[in-house]
């Protein structure tokens, strides 16, 4: 979590770090006589520029990946959307989901877990992830779906997402919009 925040901060302020590093290089070059060589100044400024370029390039690559992931996940969700809400509204306590309905829900759970994995790795922005969590919350109001979801979370097969982590994600998501 701390590294993710640092990464986002670095991406946002890489230009400020560049400015500070170049300023420090010039101050050191000016005040320390042993450093009065153009090679020191060139190396220090070049290194600072390279670091800034790396951060900017990494950010652009991650933005591209984020766009691809967002498109892929939204496409998969859109393909499931109608059936998912029909199931949510039609499945009541009087019956268990059929094997086809369970298979469909497992596909949805896998989509949710994949989204979580990419969020945890820092490739899905928190605002997007928590919007998705709030969307999941709407589906999980159905007690049968929620029961199956918790049973699946207990298996430990969803990329590290557990009941405890899910509860924390729900709590955090409530600060981004929909309250339970």
Model-assigned labels for residue ranges:
Residues 2-11, 59-180:
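Amphipathic alpha-helical "stem/stalk" segments
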Residues 10-64, 68:
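Membrane-embedded hydrophobic alpha-helical segments
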């Amino acid at each position: 979590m701390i590294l993710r925040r640092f990464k986002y901060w670095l991406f946002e302020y890489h230009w400020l770090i560049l400015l500070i590093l170049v300023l420090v290089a010039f101050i050191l070059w000016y005040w320390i006589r042993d450093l009065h060589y153009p090679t020191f100044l060139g190396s220090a400024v070049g290194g600072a520029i390279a670091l800034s370029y790396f951060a900017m390039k990494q950010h652009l690559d991650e933005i591209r990946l984020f766009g691809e992931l967002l498109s892929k996940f939204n496409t998969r969700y859109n393909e499931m959307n109608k059936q998912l809400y029909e199931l949510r509204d039609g499945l009541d306590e009087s019956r268990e989901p059929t094997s086809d309905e369970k298979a469909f829900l497992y596909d949805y759970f896998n989509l949710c877990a994949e989204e979580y994995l990419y969020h945890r790795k820092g490739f899905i922005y928190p605002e997007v992830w928590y919007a998705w969590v709030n969307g999941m919350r709407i589906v999980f109001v159905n007690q049968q779906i929620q029961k199956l979801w918790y049973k699946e979370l207990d298996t430990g097969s969803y990329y590290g997402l557990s009941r405890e982590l899910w509860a924390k994600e729900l709590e955090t998501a409530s600060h981004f919009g929909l309250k339970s």
